Amino acid sequence: MNITKLLNKVYFAPRLKEIELYTEHAGELQAGVLKRLVRMATNTEWGKKYDYASIRTYEDFKKRLPIQTYEEIKPYVARLRAGEQNLLWPSEIRWFAKSSGTTNDKSKFLPVSKESLQDTHYQGGKDAVAIYLGINPESRFFSGKGLILGGSHSPNLNSNHSLVGDLSAILIQNVHPLVNYIRVPSKEIALMSEFEPKMEAIANSTIHANVTNLSGVPSWMLVLVKHILEKTGKQSLEEVWPNLEVFFHGGVAFTPYREQYRQVIKSSKMHYVETYNASEGYFGTQNDPNDPAMLMMIDYGVFYEFIPLEDVGKENPRICCLEEVELNKNYAMVISTSAGLWRYMIGDTVKFTNNRPYKFVITGRTKHFINAFGEELIVDNAEKGLIKACAATGAQVSDYSAAPVFMDEHAKCRHQWLIEFAKMPDDLDKFAKILDDTLKEVNSDYEAKRQNDLALQPLEIIVARRNLFHDWLDSKGKLGGQHKIPRLSNTREYMEEMLKLNFKE
C-alpha cells in the first residue's frame, strides 16, 4: 500500500462520512454552528452589547444584530490591532489578514483567531484533500511535495501587538511543523515580500523537487509556471514535475486561465479543483470534476446568511439563512465566524445550483458590476461571454477589465473592455460580436438596453499591451498574494488608470 492510500484510509476517508451529512442535515449543522458561536462570544464586549446571553434562536439573532460592513467593524479592528482583546471574540487576536480595501481605505485588516485558523481555514484544506482522494483513489498525492504559492506578512507598523499579512502567508506561518516536510518552498522563501525575486527563489528551490500538487491563485501561479518553463527550457510542466497531478486554485475565477494552463500542462491526467478560501473564511470546495459548482462547507466556524442581490444597499433588505435560499438566484453572502465577524457582508455574490447538498458558484462581487444604464452586468455574465468568444475565435484571454463609457458629445453610452490576450482572436470584430451577443443571451437587462442600440451601443474592445495588468498592480504595490484585477467597475476610475498605462511608451 502506498503512503497516500494509507493516509487516506486512516486520516482522510473517515471525514467523508461526516461530509455526507451535509445532504440531509444542513439546517441542523448550521443551527449548531450559530449556537456555538453565540455561546463562545457571550462575554465579549460585542456579546454583551447585543445581549448574546438571551439569544435562543436564529430569529433572535437576526432581529438583534444589524448587517455589518468593514466600516462598522473598523473601530473594533483598530482597537484589536492596538492590543485590546475580548472585543469581538474571546480568544487572543494577533493576526490580521490584509485584504483589498474599501472606498475609504487602501486595505482591510480582518481578524484571524486560532479557532478560525484550525476549524475553518486548515480544516478546509484537509477536506479539499479528502474530497480529492475520494474521487481519485489511485492518487499518489503524498509521494511528493505540494508547492504552495502565497503572499507575505510583516509586523504591524503601528503596534507591537499585531501581525499583518496575506491570508496565504498567515496560513504558511502558522501551519503545523509536520506540514513543512511535505511542502515547498521553504517558509523563508514562501514569505518573501518582493514578488519577482520571490518567483526566482521559488523556481530555483523547486525545479528539482518531486512536486505532486500545486495550491494558489491561478494568475500568479501561471506567472511562476511560465518562469519555470523559461528557466528550464521545457515545453510543459510535467517535464519538470512528472508526478504533478492536481492544482487547488482559488482567489480569482479560473475560466480566463483554463486554456493557458492546458498549454503549459499538457497531461490529460492533470486535475483542477476550485476552492473558496477567502480572508474571512473557507467556504467551499469543488467535489465533482464535471461540475464547476462548489460544495458549501457548513460545519466549520461559519454561519451563513444571504441577501438577494437586488436588495443589497436597501435599508431593510430581505435576509435568509441557508435553508431558505432559492436555486439559480444571485445572493450577497453574509457570514458570522469564529474570528469575530458578525453578520458581516464579505462582498462576494453566489448562486446556488443544488440544495441536496448545497452547492454554489461565485458569480461576482457586490462592488464589481456595471449598472450604469440599468443593465446589471455581473462577472458571471462576463465570464460566460468570454468563454464563447474565445472558443469561436481561437483566442486566449490573460486578463480583462470593463467599465461604462458615459454619453458625451461624440458617442452614445457603451461598455469598454480592456483585454490582454495570451492569444489574439482570429477576428477581433467577431470576438466582440460574440461577446456582445452572449451577454444579451445571459442577461435580459443588458439585452433590453442594447435593443436597436438605443440605450447602449455595441461594446468596444481595446487590446491591452503585454503585461499591462501586471504593471497596473505593480504601480499599486499589489503584485502577488491575493491581489486581483477589478473585472467590472461601475465607474471609470480603474479604467482610466489602466488606459493611461496602456498607451505609455
Summary of predicted features, one role per range:
Residues I131-P177:
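Conserved AMP-binding loop of ANL adenylate-forming enzymes
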